[in-house]
Each structure stands twice: as structure tokens, then as C-alpha cells.
From Swiss-Prot:
This is Contryphan-Vn. It comes from Conus ventricosus (Mediterranean cone). The lineage of its organism: Eukaryota, Metazoa, Spiralia, Lophotrochozoa, Mollusca. The cysteine framework is C-C. One of its GO terms (cellular component) is extracellular region. PROSITE patterns: CONTRYPHAN.
Amino acid sequence: GDCPWKPWC
């Protein structure tokens, strides 16, 4: 998923 590097996740 994107959450580890996308601050708006």
C-alpha cells in the first residue's frame, strides 16, 4: 500500500 510514504494516508 501507499500509506508508509504518503502523509495523507
